[in-house]
Design a protein with these regions (language model features):
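Zn-dependent metallo-beta-lactamase
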Residues: 1-50, 234
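Core dinuclear metal-dependent hydrolase active-site scaffold
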Residues: 2-8, 42-47, 53, 168-196
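Active-site metal-binding loops of divalent metal-dependent hydrolases
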Residues: 8-10, 57-60, 91, 136-137, ...
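Residue-level marker for buried hydrophobic side chains located in beta-strands
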Residues: 53-55, 87, 131, 200-202, ...
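Metallo-beta-lactamase
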Residues: 67, 74, 83-94, 108-180, 186-259
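Short acidic capping loops at alpha-helix termini that bridge into adjacent secondary structure
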Residues: 80-83, 127-129
Length: 261
């Protein structure tokens, strides 16, 4: 399988839950608010024998009318229209921002479009992909609302024929396993992709950074920090025994471990 990290840059985040861009060459973490965390925001593209997958969708930033996630894919030689599956660990704003985009003025509103016509309408950002979302995670997003979720970016998911709502654990097309973990948020899920003798693991925000896998770290920002820590330890041990390839969404230095791709 081919793994392509789609980095959107490094950021600091504090109790305000605002993502502030951070230049690792110039900026000083000590100059940021007390308690600020340094994180990467890094969706992934995985090319398998069956699919072109996108795992989580970043912050949804645009430059010159082009979604950053789309530009990163284009830079890697992949057309956004070629993506066949979008796997969502959860719907927090730093993971789900690129699910949809503002529809260009004057365009035709398709089945995945919400909000009428014109510049205010939104459409799913991958027109030919199936989106895989835990049903209860979407419901929870609307219950919880800001500041962790931006529900207007999620409205497209509600009635689109492109969306497959998942209820609990299961397997997609015989080779993508998914499991609800909770821990970071109540309906967070993780994925194992098994193809061609390889096993890739994407742990979303329960397993966001390499260093957290190696320590008994309990995060205050997690819904159940103790469970998250225990899951990381379990996955780290099993992953080494079974030669998993780990994808780390928030790791500034090590997006893929081991880095053999």
């Amino acid at each position: 399988m081919k793994i392509i990290p789609l980095s959107e840059g490094a950021f600091t985040i504090d109790k305000t839950k605002l993502f502030v861009p951070f230049d690792t060459e110039k900026d000083d973490l000590q100059q940021r608010a007390v308690g600020s965390l340094l994180v990467e925001v890094q969706p992934f593209c995985v090319v398998t024998s069956e699919d072109i997958l996108v795992l989580d969708t970043g912050l949804g930033f645009e430059k010159d009318g082009v979604l950053q996630l789309h530009q990163n894919l284009l830079d890697a030689g992949i057309e956004p229209a070629a993506v066949t599956k979008v796997l969502m660990s959860h719907l927090h704003k730093d993971h789900a921002g690129g699910i949809s985009r503002v529809k260009a003025a004057g365009g035709d509103a398709g089945a995945g479009t919400i909000g009428g016509t014109g510049a205010s309408a939104r459409e799913l950002s991958f027109p030919n992909a199936r989106y895989y979302v835990q049903r209860k995670e979407l419901e929870y997003a609307y219950e919880k609302g800001p500041s962790s979720y931006i529900t207007e970016e999620l409205d497209c998911l509600k009635d689109s024929p492109q969306v497959v709502f998942l209820d609990g654990d299961g397997v997609l097309d015989g080779y993508i396993k998914y499991a609800v973990t909770g821990a970071h948020c109540p309906y967070h899920q993780v994925f194992w992709i098994v193809d061609g003798g390889e096993k890739i693991f994407f742990g979303g925000d329960v397993a966001p950074q390499l260093q957290q896998m190696k320590s008994r770290f309990v995060a205050k920002y997690d819904y159940d920090g103790k469970k998250a820590m225990e899951l990381r330890q379990e996955w780290w041990q099993k992953g080494q025994e079974e030669a998993w390839t780990f994808l780390f969404y928030h790791d500034v230095k090590t997006p893929v471990w081991p880095d053999s791709h």
